[in-house]
Amino acid sequence: MAAFLKMSVSVNFFRPFTRFLVPFTLHRKRNNLTILQRYMSSKIPAVTYPKNESTPPSEELELDKWKTTMKSSVQEECVSTISSSKDEDPLAATREFIEMWRLLGREVPEHITEEELKTLMECVSNTAKKKYLKYLYTKEKVKKARQIKKEMKAAAREEAKNIKLLETTEEDKQKNFLFLRLWDRNMDIAMGWKGAQAMQFGQPLVFDMAYENYMKRKELQNTVSQLLESEGWNRRNVDPFHIYFCNLKIDGALHRELVKRYQEKWDKLLLTSTEKSHVDLFPKDSIIYLTADSPNVMTTFRHDKVYVIGSFVDKSMQPGTSLAKAKRLNLATECLPLDKYLQWEIGNKNLTLDQMIRILLCLKNNGNWQEALQFVPKRKHTGFLEISQHSQEFINRLKKAKT
């Protein structure tokens, strides 16, 4: 018992001095400790063996780096082949460039036309080419989706037609019909006669096509869409204009887009398209250039004048372009009286080409501004201003004088 007490006393006596017996301890997970921290450590002293550095680290296969290296090498090879064959045949070099990008997994369309190839060749940088190819790829996907949807609808209609039992024949349907049916062919013939009469005796209306250098490709396509709508509204009107497409460059951007949209109907259109300017076709004193920037407000529609509309969709905000051109040619300019009749809210006073021709057709037929300005988009104004009694009397006098 006494020996045990002596042993416990000796252990208790040396316990505070254990940290001084082995001043430096080696811990694998605490190699970054300072000497003082190791000296003051209260853990039990321990000696560990150093890490065996003779074993080599596991080699990792970096697939991403390998892929990027291979892609860069293929891209360099693509650029070198294009630069070498550029002098020989640019079209073949562009096709090879597209094929290389397709092999690289880029977004490239499956089919590309000669016109799109020429547009791609006109791109200055590789970034512009990449953006244009991505646009064509997206456009092709949308077209395929629409085609699939169209085929599904056609199949559903055919199935419904086969299921449905027809109770009466086509002859019975015509007998039971109250009015005589007007076929599409008869309507086309009637509108064709009106168009032919307008080309001989109708009032000219000019669309100035001299703005294709001011527009980007998207704006140019939007312009052509508005021209198609304008021609359609004019063709269906009771008293159509004789439409002139002036300053239309043959094989220019606008001409190519118009031929692409109309296809074989382009040569059958009852309108006049020419490379000449409207100044060469009509006397200057009979021309009025309609532009929203003009300080002169249009009061009445003049049947003895030739109105000119600029075929210009301006998304990049270039105000005063058409006004400056009219001033250079010493032409009279006018703008629509939108502030006089409408409570204008927001936005500029530039209207689309189809809205302009519908307003002019309405003014040509009845001269009523309130009816004509209904074609102005409702989002731009809050309604019509109240017409004073003096203005109403003036309108009534004009109507009496006309009758």
Curated annotation (Swiss-Prot):
Residues of the transit peptide: 1-39
Record annotation: effect of changing residue 181 to L: In COXPD30; decreased protein abundance; impaired mitochondrial tRNA processing; has no effect on steady-state mitochondrial-mRNA and mitochondrial-tRNA levels but indirectly impairs mitochondrial translation
Classification via Gene3D superfamilies: 3.40.1280.30
Effect recorded for residue 272 to A: In COXPD30; decreased protein abundance; impaired mitochondrial tRNA processing; has no effect on steady-state mitochondrial-mRNA and mitochondrial-tRNA levels but indirectly impairs mitochondrial translation
Protein's GO biological process: mitochondrial RNA 5'-end processing; mitochondrial tRNA 3'-end processing; mitochondrial tRNA 5'-end processing; mitochondrial tRNA methylation; mitochondrial tRNA processing; mRNA processing; positive regulation of mitochondrial translation
Keywords: Coiled coil, Disease variant, Methyltransferase, Mitochondrion, Mitochondrion nucleoid, Phosphoprotein, Primary mitochondrial disease, S-adenosyl-L-methionine, Transferase, Transit peptide, tRNA processing
Residue ranges constituting the SAM-dependent MTase TRM10-type domain according to the UniProt record: 191-383
GO molecular function: identical protein binding; RNA binding; tRNA (adenine(9)-N1)-methyltransferase activity; tRNA (guanosine(9)-N1)-methyltransferase activity; tRNA binding
EC class of the enzyme, as a word: transferase
Reaction equations catalysed: adenosine(9) in tRNA + S-adenosyl-L-methionine = N(1)-methyladenosine(9) in tRNA + S-adenosyl-L-homocysteine + H(+); guanosine(9) in tRNA + S-adenosyl-L-methionine = N(1)-methylguanosine(9) in tRNA + S-adenosyl-L-homocysteine + H(+); an adenosine in mRNA + S-adenosyl-L-methionine = an N(1)-methyladenosine in mRNA + S-adenosyl-L-homocysteine + H(+)
Modified residue annotations for Phosphoserine: 84
Quaternary structure annotation from Swiss-Prot or TrEMBL: Component of mitochondrial ribonuclease P, a complex composed of TRMT10C/MRPP1, HSD17B10/MRPP2 and PRORP/MRPP3. Interacts with HSD17B10/MRPP2; forming the MRPP1-MRPP2 subcomplex of the mitochondrial ribonuclease P complex. Interacts with GRSF1.
Function comment: Mitochondrial tRNA N(1)-methyltransferase involved in mitochondrial tRNA maturation. Component of mitochondrial ribonuclease P, a complex composed of TRMT10C/MRPP1, HSD17B10/MRPP2 and PRORP/MRPP3, which cleaves tRNA molecules in their 5'-ends. Together with HSD17B10/MRPP2, forms a subcomplex of the mitochondrial ribonuclease P, named MRPP1-MRPP2 subcomplex, which displays functions that are independent of the ribonuclease P activity.
Disease link: Combined oxidative phosphorylation deficiency 30: An autosomal recessive, severe mitochondrial disease characterized by lactic acidosis, hypotonia, feeding difficulties, deafness, and respiratory failure with fatal issue. Patient skeletal muscle cells show decreased activities of mitochondrial complexes I, III and IV.
Record-stated family: Belongs to the class IV-like SAM-binding methyltransferase superfamily. TRM10 family.
The protein's name: tRNA methyltransferase 10 homolog C
